[in-house]
Amino acid sequence: RSPALRKAALCLVLCTAAVQGARAADTLPQTLPREVAAELGDLYVYYNDRICPLQTLAKDFTVKLCGKSRYRGLTPEQVLSGWLFYYDDWKREPMIRIRSAGARRLLEVGGRYARLSDFRNRVNEYRLEGAAGRPAGEADEKFNIIGMVCTGSMLRIFPYTDPSDSLLRWASQVDGLPRELPHGQALFIGRAMNYVSELVVKRDWAGVAGVLRKIRSYQQKEGGAHMPSGLRFRAEKLYNRLDWSLPLAAAFILTGIGGFLDACRRMVRGRAFGAKTRGWLLAGVAAGGLYLTLMLALRGYVSGHWPVSNGYETMRFMAWCTLLLTLLFARRFLFLLPFGYLIAGLSLIVSMMGESNPQITQLMPVLDSPLLCIHVMLVMVAYALLAFVMFGGVAGVVLHRRARGAAAQLQAVSRLMLYPAVFCLAAGIFVGAVWANVSWGRYWGWDPKEVWALVTLLVYALPLHAGSLPWFRRPLFFHWFCIAAFLSVLVTYFGVNFLLGGMHSYAG
């Protein structure tokens, strides 16, 4: 009866309601248990013109929607199966990342993430109808991909031999099938996933796992020799699980910045890294190099070609080259350790950008050449060395006033690195010209990439002629030139691959 008690009781009720509301907001949408979803990920699927684990499609689908390979602790297979079997739950989940402010205005969402239900207004009209431009196109693509998953048309998991030409084809449960196909097989293709849906509604997880295993047995029997080997299948699943690029890149960049500041402080005072610090930094480089070696080897084994065929792969290869060069040079030039961390970290960050993240695909014939691999490797080694020279220039400019001796030492080291860098770049251009002649019947065509590669070679050849060009004997001028010259590398790689046209642009 006390007023104080009544107020306390009212506060308790309100707090309880608030907690329950927060819990409801935090409740995960329905999906399959992790073990059952893993069975779904173990199926084969025809995706991106190749046969791969359905786990790969699930990962790409999740990254496409929310920008991460996991969502609120759920695995990619759980996200995919959630959309497939619990559409009504997931259409209200704010997980679709909308980068463009213009697209967010069209969808009338306040944050960076939208619900599928936000794509239609109250009278069920599609909000992006008639919207033009790349931002609206990206949002529209995500809407359509969700539709393809929810209807099952993207899940081409049923192989069959076409009676008309005896070729192996892959179908989803909603695809049309040849009339000559045996009735039992056609019935299995059309009804298997519907039966899985019925078992999901009953929450018969053992039954769901059993049917998924039967589908996998059917795939192996019908696919026969066309299926990837068990080792390659497991290698791709391991590759999908071990993608730790973002935390590795962040750790490398933070270590590189801290190491760079510490190195500048030590060079001003005339001190070197302590043995313990040097050991930890070298161990980090070695660990990162081993991880990238494993990831490149897995990607190359899964794809069936050297992993240097597009922007994503070449930037990861450049990170690997950087770490290797750091290990080779760091014992003689300890201050290169922070540069190695920075270059490798930035390369990994760039590889994860939207434009530089194509899926694992089969190579078009013109790219399936050992000459291309040699060409790309030589150029990436050159770019890694030139990046070291650029960071050496930054350090030289910073230290010029307080430690002129250190700036002069950095100039000598940078000039030493320029020789193999220019050699590798020239050799890479030469091998690329031979590859162009084999592929297209001409050595040189003044393509934008070829022009800018030649410009980069000529720019970096200038500091090597300090005997004829006395300006390059001055440490400060040399360092500023090396910083500015790196712009030609950026234009050659990023400007041509992503902005300019030409025959090289598709490779980015």
Kindly give the residue locations of the regions a language model identified.
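Positively charged n-region of N-terminal signal peptides that target proteins for export
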Residues: 2, 6-7
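Individual transmembrane alpha-helix segments
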Residues: 233-249
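Bacterial N-terminal signal peptides
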Residues: 8-17
